[in-house]
From Swiss-Prot:
Coiled coil: none annotated. Belongs to the glycosyl hydrolase 24 family. The gene is rrrQ. The keyword Ligase does not apply. It catalyses: Hydrolysis of (1->4)-beta-linkages between N-acetylmuramic acid and N-acetyl-D-glucosamine residues in a peptidoglycan and between N-acetyl-D-glucosamine residues in chitodextrins. Its EC number is 3.2.1.17. The keyword Hydrolase applies. The active site is at residues 35, 44. One of its GO terms (molecular function) is lysozyme activity. InterPro entries: Bacteriophage_GH24 (IPR051018), Endolysin_T4_type (IPR034690), Glyco_hydro_24 (IPR002196), Lysozyme-like_dom_sf (IPR023346), Lysozyme_dom_sf (IPR023347), SAR_endolysin-like (IPR043688). One of its GO terms (biological process) is cell wall macromolecule catabolic process. This is Probable prophage lysozyme. It comes from Escherichia coli (strain K12).
């Protein structure tokens, strides 16, 4: 089976993994693909004002309508947010991780659902208990956006289902080898 089809990851992400790239490099590529990089504030799927790759706060200020940043400023904000997400993984995950696994967890927990929802989650508990396969299964349960079931395509959030599959693939990268 084609690796892209099997894991749903882009050729660019797979190439980085194959080349032995670092977690920051993999996460940057993955988040660019999932979040985009918007220099003008926009509402995310839950109606929250965001900018760049999903930042809700810039320089201590909440993102507001019509906020505009340069690409260079977004690059700086994105690097700060990426580094915070990866630092969270380093502090809170107690099992050894590969670079793709760090990127997958950073995207899912601190970056997308937030630490407040991650800490009590089955995913977090299973992962730190050493049940990696169970943790990867639990990522796929997070498929609601603003109360909408994203498996229902007419809810216009099916990308969430795809993202969870991809985050699960990264988080479990290599455990079956």
């Amino acid at each position: 089976m084609n690796t892209k089809i099997r894991y749903g990851l882009s050729a660019a992400v797979l190439a980085l993994i194959g080349a032995g790239a670092s977690a920051p490099q993999i996460l940057d590529q993955f988040l660019d693909e999932k979040e985009g990089n918007h220099t003008m504030a926009y509402r995310d799927g839950s109606g929250i004002w965001t900018i760049c790759r999903g930042a809700t706060v810039v320089d201590g200020k909440t993102v507001f309508p019509n906020m505009k940043l340069s690409k260079e400023k977004c690059d700086q904000v994105n690097a700060i947010e990426r580094d915070k997400a990866l630092a969270w993984v380093e502090r809170n995950i107690k099992v050894p991780l590969t670079e793709p696994q760090k990127a997958g967890i950073a995207s899912f927990c601190p970056y997308n659902i937030g630490p407040g929802k991650c800490f009590p989650s089955t995913f977090y508990k299973r992962l730190n208990a050493g049940d990696r396969k169970g943790a990867c299964e639990a990522i796929r349960w997070w498929i609601k956006d603003g109360g909408r079931d994203c498996r229902i395509r007419s809810n216009n959030c099916y990308g969430q289902v795809i993202r969870r599959d991809q985050e699960s693939a990264l988080t479990c990268w290599g455990i079956e080898q």
